[in-house]
C-alpha cells in the first residue's frame, strides 16, 4: 500500500463511521457567545469555566506584559526565555497550591508527556485509569515503563495492580475531573493506596483547578490530597493556555535537567505569564464566579431531569448528554446550531465505541435564560 493509499483509506474509514473531525473558524471570542461561519451562537462547547478569557483585568495584564517584554519569550527557559513574569507566576502557583515548586509548560499535553518521559524507566510500571486523557495514555504507552490500565475510578482495581511485584518504581496516574464524562476521581482513596504501596500518584487536574476547592485550588485540595505530582492547566478556568507541574524541590530540579519538552521548547510569552498572574488573582477572589457556575449546573441538571435526558452522573461544568450513535450525535448538534446554540458532538475514538454524546459545558458567564433556552431546544429536538 502506497503512502497516498494509506492516507486515503484512513480518511475514508473516518468518514464512513461518521467520526471525521472538522475545524470551525472562530471569528470572534470564545465566551458566552461565539461567532462561527458568520453566525452568532450561544456557546456551550468552551472550557472557559469562569469566563476569564474575556476578563478585562486579564486582558490588560497581557497588554502590559507585551509592552514590557514584547510578544515572545525569545527562546527556551534554559537559554533566555525565563523572565521575571515566569518566575513570579511559578512562585505564586507553588504558594497557592502548597508545593515547594512549580514549573511552567507550554501546554497540559506537553507537561503530561514530559513527566512520564523523564521519570519512567524500563523496570518501572505506570498504572493509569482507563479513561485518562490521551496525553497521559500516549506518553505511558511510549515510555520504557510497563503500562497497566485499571477500571475507571475503581480503587480496588488499582489496589490489585499495586499488589503485583515490580522491580522498579510505580506511578499511578489519574485525572481530577474526567474531560468526557465530567466525573471526579476518588483521589483520597487512590492516594491512600499508593502511599501504602510506596508508589507515587500523579493527578492531571485540568478541569478541576480554578473551579473546585477553597479559592479554586482544585480537586486535590477539595479532597484533602497532595499527590506527589500535580498537573494544572491554564486552558480551562484560567481562560488562557499553558500548564504547570507542582512537585517537590528535587523533582523540579530533575525535570529541569531531563524533561526534554521543557528544555527544547520555546517558553510561553512573558505577557502570557503576566496574564496568568491576573487570572490567578481572579480565581483566588472568585467565589462569586464559582457560585454562579454551580447555580448554572444545578439549573441545567434539574431541567434535564424533568425532560428525562440521559446525562452522566457529573456534577461539574462538563455535562455530557449520551446519544450512542455517531450520526445521531452529529444530527442533534446540527439541530441545535440551527436554533443558535453551539454544542459539540463527541465521537469515537475520543470516547469508546457506542459512546457518542453532546458534550455540554457550562460556565459562570452563562445567564439563567441561556440555560433555559438550551433546555427548551433540547426538548424540541426530541433527544
Curated annotation (Swiss-Prot):
Cofactor(s) the record lists: pyridoxal 5'-phosphate
Lineage: Bacteria, Pseudomonadati, Pseudomonadota, Gammaproteobacteria, Enterobacterales
Residues that hold substrate according to the record: 21, 133, 350
HAMAP family: BioF_aminotrans_2 (MF_01693)
Signal peptide per UniProt: none
Function as written in the Swiss-Prot or TrEMBL entry: Catalyzes the decarboxylative condensation of pimeloyl-[acyl-carrier protein] and L-alanine to produce 8-amino-7-oxononanoate (AON), [acyl-carrier protein], and carbon dioxide.
Organism field: Serratia proteamaculans (strain 568)
UniProt protein name: 8-amino-7-oxononanoate synthase
NCBIfam families (alphabetical): bioF
Gene: bioF
Molecular functions per Gene Ontology: 8-amino-7-oxononanoate synthase activity; pyridoxal phosphate binding
Keyword Ligase: no
Amino acid at each position: 500500500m502506497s503512502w497516498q493509499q494509506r492516507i486515503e483509506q484512513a480518511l475514508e474509514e473516518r468518514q464512513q463511521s461518521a467520526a471525521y473531525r472538522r475545524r470551525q473558524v472562530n471569528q470572534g471570542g470564545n465566551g458566552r457567545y461565539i461567532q462561527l461561519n458568520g453566525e452568532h451562537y450561544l456557546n456551550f462547547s468552551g472550557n472557559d469555566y469562569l469566563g476569564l478569557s474575556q476578563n478585562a483585568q486579564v486582558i490588560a495584564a497581557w497588554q502590559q506584559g507585551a509592552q514590557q517584554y514584547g510578544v515572545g519569550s525569545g527562546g527556551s527557559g534554559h537559554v533566555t526565555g525565563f523572565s521575571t513574569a515566569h518566575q513570579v507566576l511559578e512562585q505564586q502557583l507553588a504558594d497557592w497550591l502548597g508545593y515547594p515548586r512549580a514549573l511552567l509548560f507550554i501546554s497540559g499535553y506537553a507537561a503530561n508527556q514530559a513527566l512520564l518521559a523523564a521519570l519512567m524507566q524500563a523496570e518501572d510500571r505506570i498504572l493509569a485509569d482507563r479513561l485518562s486523557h490521551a496525553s497521559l495514555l500516549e506518553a505511558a504507552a511510549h515510555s520504557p515503563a510497563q503500562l497497566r490500565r485499571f477500571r475507571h475510578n475503581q480503587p480496588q482495581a488499582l489496589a490489585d495492580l499495586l499488589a503485583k511485584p515490580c522491580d522498579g518504581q510505580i506511578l499511578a496516574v489519574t485525572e481530577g475531573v474526567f474531560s468526557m464524562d465530567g466525573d471526579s476521581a476518588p483521589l483520597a482513596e487512590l492516594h491512600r493506596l499508593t502511599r501504602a504501596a510506596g508508589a507515587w500518584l500523579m493527578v492531571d487536574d485540568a478541569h478541576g483547578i480554578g473551579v473546585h476547592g477553597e479559592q479554586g485550588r482544585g480537586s486535590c485540595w477539595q479532597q484533602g490530597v497532595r499527590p506527589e505530582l500535580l498537573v494544572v492547566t491554564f486552558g480551562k478556568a484560567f481562560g488562557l493556555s499553558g500548564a504547570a507541574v507542582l512537585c517537590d524541590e528535587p523533582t523540579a530540579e530533575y525535570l529541569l535537567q531531563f524533561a526534554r519538552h521543557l528544555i527544547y521548547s520555546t517558553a510561553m510569552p512573558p505577557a502570557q505569564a503576566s496574564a496568568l498572574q491576573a487570572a490567578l488573582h481572579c480565581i483566588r477572589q472568585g467565589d462569586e464566579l464559582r457560585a454562579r457556575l454551580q447555580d448554572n449546573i444545578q439549573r441545567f441538571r434539574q431541567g434535564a431531569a424533568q425532560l428525562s435526558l440521559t446525562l452522566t452522573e457529573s456534577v461539574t461544568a462538563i455535562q455530557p448528554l449520551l446519544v450512542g450513535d455517531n450520526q445521531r450525535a452529529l444530527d442533534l448538534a446540527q439541530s441545535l446550531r440551527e436554533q443558535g446554540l453551539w454544542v459539540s458532538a463527541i465521537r469515537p475514538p475520543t470516547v469508546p465505541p457506542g459512546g457518542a454524546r453532546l458534550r455540554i459545558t457550562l460556565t459562570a458567564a452563562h445567564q439563567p435564560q441561556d440555560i433555559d433556552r438550551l433546555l427548551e431546544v433540547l426538548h424540541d429536538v426530541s433527544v
